[in-house]
Amino acid sequence: MAKDDVIEVEGTVIEALPNAMFQVQLDNGHKVLAHVSGKLRMNFIRILPGDRVKVELSPYDLTRGRIVWRGK
């Protein structure tokens, strides 16, 4: 899958799950299961419930995503 094919949306982390997985409530109301991208993991970026995040979704499975950015 090419980088151009991803769908970027913003949301809020509502729950931290085991294995660096998070339940994210998107701005459009949907909930997705998201994991932390490699760059955030390498730089030890902490993600807590309530944080604003940017999530990349695959067009093939819109229920799972990758967290690529953390706001305040």
Curated annotation (Swiss-Prot):
Location of this chain's protein in the cell: Cytoplasm
PROSITE patterns documented for this protein: S1_IF1_TYPE (PS50832)
InterPro entries in alphabetical order: NA-bd_OB-fold (IPR012340), RNA-binding_domain_S1_IF1 (IPR006196), S1_domain (IPR003029), TIF_IF1 (IPR004368)
Gene Ontology annotations for the cellular component aspect, listed alphabetically: cytosol
Gene3D superfamilies per the UniProt record, alphabetical: Nucleic acid-binding proteins
Residue ranges annotated for the S1-like domain, each copy included: 1-72
Superkingdom of this protein's organism: Bacteria
Any one GO molecular function term: rRNA binding
Keywords for the protein's UniProt record, in alphabetical order: Cytoplasm, Initiation factor, Protein biosynthesis, RNA-binding, rRNA-binding
Free-text function comment from the UniProt entry: One of the essential components for the initiation of protein synthesis. Stabilizes the binding of IF-2 and IF-3 on the 30S subunit to which N-formylmethionyl-tRNA(fMet) subsequently binds. Helps modulate mRNA selection, yielding the 30S pre-initiation complex (PIC). Upon addition of the 50S ribosomal subunit IF-1, IF-2 and IF-3 are released leaving the mature 70S translation initiation complex.
HAMAP family registered for this protein in UniProt: IF_1
Protein family according to the UniProt entry: Belongs to the IF-1 family.
Quaternary assembly: Component of the 30S ribosomal translation pre-initiation complex which assembles on the 30S ribosome in the order IF-2 and IF-3, IF-1 and N-formylmethionyl-tRNA(fMet); mRNA recruitment can occur at any time during PIC assembly.
The name this protein goes by in its record: Translation initiation factor IF-1
Protein source organism: Caldanaerobacter subterraneus subsp. tengcongensis (strain DSM 15242 / JCM 11007 / NBRC 100824 / MB4) (Thermoanaerobacter tengcongensis)
